Amino acid sequence: ERHTQILDEESEFSVEDLIADEMMVVTVSNAGYIKRLPVSTYRKQRRGGKGITGMETKDEDFVRDLFIASTHQYMLFFSNAGRVYWRKVHELPRAGRTARGRAIVNLLELSGGEFITACLPVRDLKEEGKTVFMVTNKGVVKKTLLKSFSNPRATGIIAIDIDEGDELIDVQITTGEDNILLATAKGKAIRFPEKDVRSMGRTARGVVGIRMEDGDSVIGMSLAADESTVLTVTENGFGKRTKVGEYRLQHRGG
């Protein structure tokens, strides 16, 4: 008696089904070079060890971002022009430990003068309750639901409408319940609840997050939990550590 059955059925199959779900170290340099390599490349050492070279950089270049992400995760790339691009981690160039990697401009369809200012690893683009919080050089902030970025396009899509002369400088994934800390080049800072900023569509401009004097600009953003501390470092190497609670919580636009 024959037990073999031939079924006339179709099943969905993608190249990703053949790619192992492996944890990778993704590094991005300030000059815009990116690469990935397995976490296992970095052997565990004791405290006080010398460490190993993780990326070769040219003069005046340095590693700006480092992420641990699965090969099946997405990387969202946000540009200074307010656009967002996608790549799966397994699509990023795999290179040796000391290699520079590949220029991001050769991976994404960027316009002239456009460069990447923020990278975010994301497992599920349709995850409920997650938002994307953005800030520009001139202090404009905007919050958009993560699922609004779930339809990738090779040419990217608008993440925020940028005013002339302004640039997107930082992006974070938030829960909708976080506190936001913005810092400026002249040493000013503001901490306000994320709830002060309503969710907006992708093409919206955003609202004022901090008001600044002429010549000042926002240089960074952090999620500021009440029990955390803030490390502030100046261009000349001076630094200090401050409890977040010393930055009083106020409304956005202060």
What are these regions (language model features)?
Residues 1-254:
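Short, structured "edge-of-domain" segments at secondary-structure transitions
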